[in-house]
C-alpha cells in the first residue's frame, strides 16, 4: 500500500515490551536533551522539545526524568554532548533504511551500525540514497480494539480536523498529517475524546517494497530489531511490506 509504514504497525505491537526493557526512556531522554540544547528549554518556544516531551509523556516517563533531561540540554545539569545525524542504506531484499541517530562518538557509532548491517544482510549507502523515498508526516495511530470510536467516526473526525489521509490495517487506524498541522490535528481529536496509542512526526515511505519471501522477511525483521536495539539509534524507518500470511507464519514459529 502506497505511503504506509508496515514497520510502524509492527513497532506498535512491540511497544509494551520496549517499555519494560527501559531502553525507551534512555532514548527519549536523549531526544529531549538534544532538542533543549538546540532550541532552548522552553517547550512553548521550541516545537522539537514540545514533541519530545509529549512523546515521553505518552510513554509514561516520569516528570523528574523529563526535567533532568531538559536541564542537561540547557546546561543547568552536566551531561553528555550528543550529536544528531542520519544514516541511509539498504536491508535484505533491497528494502530502504533511514536511520535517525544521536551519539557522543560518531565514529564509534558508524563502525557499530556498519557491523549490525553487514551481519544482517544490509549495507550503508550514500547520503540521500533513500531519503527521497520517504516523506516527513505527522502519524497518529489509534488501536481500534481499544477505542470508543468506530473506524468511520474516526475517519470523519480526522479529516474534519485537517488530516491528509487515514489508513486502516491490522485493527490499527493511522492518521497522517502535514508536519505543520500535526499538533493542531492531535489537539482537536483529543478534545473529541480520541486516544492515540502513538503519535509522532515520522518518515513515511512513499511506496512500499513487497517482501513476499519468508526467509527474506525474517532477515528484514531481524535487522530492524537489531537496529532498534542499538542505544544510539533513535528511529528506524523502512519501506518494506510483508504480507499478513507471512507475518502470521513468522509469528507462530
UniProtKB/Swiss-Prot annotation:
Keyword field: Cytoplasm, DNA-binding, Transcription, Transcription regulation
Keyword presence, Transcription: yes
Primary location class: cytoplasm
Pfam families: TACO1_YebC_N, Transcrip_reg
Alphabetized GO MF terms: DNA binding
Subcellular localization, as worded in the UniProt entry: Cytoplasm
Keyword tRNA processing recorded: no
A GO biological-process term: regulation of DNA-templated transcription
Region annotated Disordered, chain positions: 1-21
Protein name: Probable transcriptional regulatory protein Hore_12350
Classification of source organism: Bacteria, Bacillati, Bacillota, Clostridia, Halanaerobiales
Amino acid at each position: 500500500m502506497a505511503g504506509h509504514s508496515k514497520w510502524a504497525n509492527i513497532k506498535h505491537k512491540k511497544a509494551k515490551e520496549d517499555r519494560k526493557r527501559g531502553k525507551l526512556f534512555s532514548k527519549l531522554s536523549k531526544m529531549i536533551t538534544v532538542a533543549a540544547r538546540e532550541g532552548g528549554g522552553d517547550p512553548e518556544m521550541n516545537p522539537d522539545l514540545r514533541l519530545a516531551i509529549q512523546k515521553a509523556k505518552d510513554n509514561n516517563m516520569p516528570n523528574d526524568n523529563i526535567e533532568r533531561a531538559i536541564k542537561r540540554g540547557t546546561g543547568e545539569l552536566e551531561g553528555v554532548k550528543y550529536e544528531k545525524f542520519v544514516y541511509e542504506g539498504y536491508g535484505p531484499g533491497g528494502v530502504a533504511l533511514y536511520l535517525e541517530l544521536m551519539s557522543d562518538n560518531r565514529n564509534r557509532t558508524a563502525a557499530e551500525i556498519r557491523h549490525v548491517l553487514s551481519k544482517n544482510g544490509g549495507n550503508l549507502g550514500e547520503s540521500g540514497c533513500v531519503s527521497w523515498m520517504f516523506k516527513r508526516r505527522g502519524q497518529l495511530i489509534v488501536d481500534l480494539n481499544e477505542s470508543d470510536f468506530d473506524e468511520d467516526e474516526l475517519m470523519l473526525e480526522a479529516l474534519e480536523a485537517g488530516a491528509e489521509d487515514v489508513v486502516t490495517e491490522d485493527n490499527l487506524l493511522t492518521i497522517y498529517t502535514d508536519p505543520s498541522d500535526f499538533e493542531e490535528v492531535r489537539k482537536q481529536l483529543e478534545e473529541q475524546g480520541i486516544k492515540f496509542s502513538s503519535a509522532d512526526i515520522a518518515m513515511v515511505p512513499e511506496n512500499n517494497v513487497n517482501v513476499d519471501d519468508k526467509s527474506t522477511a525474517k532477515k528484514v525483521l531481524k535487522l530492524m530489531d537489531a537496529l532498534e536495539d542499538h542505544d544510539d539509534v533513535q528511529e528506524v524507518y523502512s519501506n518494506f511490506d510483508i504480507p499478513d500470511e507471512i507475518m502470521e507464519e513468522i509469528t507462530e514459529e
